[in-house]
Amino acid sequence: ALPIYALELWHGPTCAFKDYALQLMPKLLVEAKKNLGRTEKTLILVATSGDTGKAALDGYHDIPGVEIAVFYPTGGTSEIQRLQMATQEGANVAVYAVRGNYDDAQTGVKKVFGDTAIAAELAKRNIRLSSANSINWGRLVPQIVYYFAAYAQLIKAGRITFGDEVDFCVPTGNFGDILAGYYAKRMGLPVGKLVCASNENNVLTDFLTTGTYTAKREFFKTTSPSMDILVSSNLERLLYHVTGSDAEVAGLMKSLAETGSYTVRPETLAAIQENFSCGWSSEEEVVGEIGRAHV
């Protein structure tokens, strides 16, 4: 059997892997505003299923010229995550519970970003919207780094030699972290397969297997709430890279919005499967494997 290694990404201040991006991203925003001569206040809107909320609040709290509002689904995060967000200190932070699931919160935030009337009203108040979710490219860029860091660590430890291909298995909900691995591969990192690991909300596993994405399905609340997502927004980026067609991807996203599903062409699915494989685990399997690994 091939050796298996675990990349520890819980050493940030909130114990979420997203700390690696969200500790850097606020500093990049401040520098970007300075370089562009921007003086307006920035309002960060965040939808979270758990991890992103606290990590974003911790990164952006008390950053001058910035305010942040986080929206999470009622009962859709772990109690620890809810308390982490609710107790966040800072004069510029706000947290709101949303009736619905993560997809409802994410869709609502996206609608605000696309509402020109809201943008005009905020402009009168000298406020500009931004995002700390992975729809913001600034979230994905720092995540590319630790794929290279992991590869370098394996070389340093003598486990591989430079040029050996390494597969990465990534727990996946919104397709952001695994997409960062795809970008690392495109940049030249010797990556074999990127394995998309899903829980019972296995919409991505079905898509990567069949080529049909169906968001209209039963939603499960699981013990991995950060992966309880049915509309994976970063998949749109992958589809663009594979098809190279704005119009085709726009058509797929229109179908998703109107019918809840879409199907890609066979050659598109084949191109995706060259880089990605997938699998999912039931709640029973998850609990059993945690017990096997840690007891």
Where are these regions (language model features)?
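Well-ordered mid-protein domain cores that form the structural environment of catalytic cofactors
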Residues: 5-62
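Active-site nucleophile and cofactor-binding loops and adjacent substrate-binding regions
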Residues: 15-17, 43-49, 132-140, 168-174, ...
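A glycine- and small-aliphatic-rich helix-loop capping segment at beta-alpha/alpha-beta transitions
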Residues: 23-34, 59-69, 86-89, 185-191, ...
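Short glycine/serine/threonine-rich phosphate/pyrophosphate-binding segments
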Residues: 45-58, 79-80, 174-181, 204
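Short internal beta-strands
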Residues: 69-75, 96-97, 192-199
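Active-site/ligand-binding loops adjacent to catalytic centers
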Residues: 82-139, 144, 200-292
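Acidic, glycine-rich loop-and-beta core segments that form the ion-binding/anion-interacting portion
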Residues: 141-224
